[in-house]
Amino acid sequence: MNQERLIAAEDITFRYQKDADRPALDHVSFHVSKGEWLAIVGHNGSGKSTLARALNGLILPDEGSIKVGGIKLTEETVWDVRKKVGMVFQNPDNQFVGTTVRDDVAFGLENSGVPREDMVERVDWAVQQVNMQEFLDQEPHHLSGGQKQRVAIAGVLAARPDIMILDEATSMLDPMGREEVLDTVRRLKDQGMVTVISITHDLNEAAKADRIIVMNSGRKFAEGTPQEVFRLNQDLIKIGLDLPFSFQLTQMLKESGLALKGDHLTQEGLVNELWTLKSKM
């Protein structure tokens, strides 16, 4: 993985109210490397969504600093930073502003004054990346939740940011829609098109990331690969997080004496190893 740092957050603190007893972000430091998928997880009120807003300049930290693509985030640089960061939010219906898929993907480009010929090329390219090219002239009420979120991702891609932040972007989708969106994100990330930060309370979603930061009470509680973080097990449960079912089942099978080698984050991985063990019996 290319280790160029796209985001460097150093000791950031933020309070929504200056006299608040506890800050929403309490001396948080981390970095994000180019080409990485970082998941930031936590229960409601943990600080994860506040962190997402800080990374896009929707709020500015009271203390500490954030650099995005080498640019220090300030009131003067916030629009330069936002050109580098695109966001996909929770509710797909609240994000759809065009009358058709084509209009929606083009909306941000029109506001940025992109020439029409360039805009048409970008829209066509972006919808192809999310496999929505057959729906260009469809109205939003004809689309599923997963399809609307893929259109939102296309709108972000068309603007050509370095980083895409998914702020609970799958939480209102059914399982099929959720997998559609996450598979799309993984493919775009693997093809080197964008660096991904996903904000979520769902550890099944976080398991797909390269690295996880766990937030609790405004502080960084843990950080590591999915396997490293999930091994905290009961510590995560105590702060209101549910471990992925496949990981829990793997641990139960190991405790019962089954000689499993992996800490499986997906059901597919667990099933494959079980079949391998069965074939050796």
UniProtKB/Swiss-Prot annotation:
Organism, per UniProt? Bacillus licheniformis (strain ATCC 14580 / DSM 13 / JCM 2505 / CCUG 7422 / NBRC 12200 / NCIMB 9375 / NCTC 10341 / NRRL NRS-1264 / Gibson 46)
Put simply, this protein is called Energy-coupling factor transporter ATP-binding protein EcfA1
**Homology family:** Belongs to the ABC transporter superfamily. Energy-coupling factor EcfA family.
Matching entries from Pfam families are given as: ABC_tran
ABC transporter domain location, by residue? 7-242
Enzyme class, UniProt record, top EC level: translocase
The cellular component terms of Gene Ontology attached to this UniProt record, alphabetical and capped at eight, are: ATP-binding cassette (ABC) transporter complex
NCBIfam families in UniProt: ECF_ATPase_1, PRK13635.1, PRK13648.1
Q: Which cellular compartments is it found in?
A: Cell membrane
Amino-acid positions noted as binding ATP in the UniProt annotation, renumbered to this chain: G42, H43, N44, G45, S46, G47, K48, S49
Q: Which GO terms describe its molecular function?
A: ATP binding; ATP hydrolysis activity; ATPase-coupled transmembrane transporter activity
Job of this protein: ATP-binding (A) component of a common energy-coupling factor (ECF) ABC-transporter complex. Unlike classic ABC transporters this ECF transporter provides the energy necessary to transport a number of different substrates.
Bilayer topology annotation: Peripheral membrane protein
**How the protein assembles, per its UniProt entry?**
Forms a stable energy-coupling factor (ECF) transporter complex composed of 2 membrane-embedded substrate-binding proteins (S component), 2 ATP-binding proteins (A component) and 2 transmembrane proteins (T component).
* Ribonucleoprotein as UniProt keyword: no
Q: Which CDD domains match?
A: ABC_cobalt_CbiO_domain1
Keyword Cell membrane in the entry? The reply is yes
Tell me the domain of life: Bacteria
Q: EC number(s) in its UniProt entry?
A: 7.-.-.-
Write the record's keywords in alphabetical order, separated by commas. ATP-binding, Cell membrane, Membrane, Nucleotide-binding, Translocase, Transport
Its ancestry begins with:
Bacteria, Bacillati, Bacillota, Bacilli, Bacillales
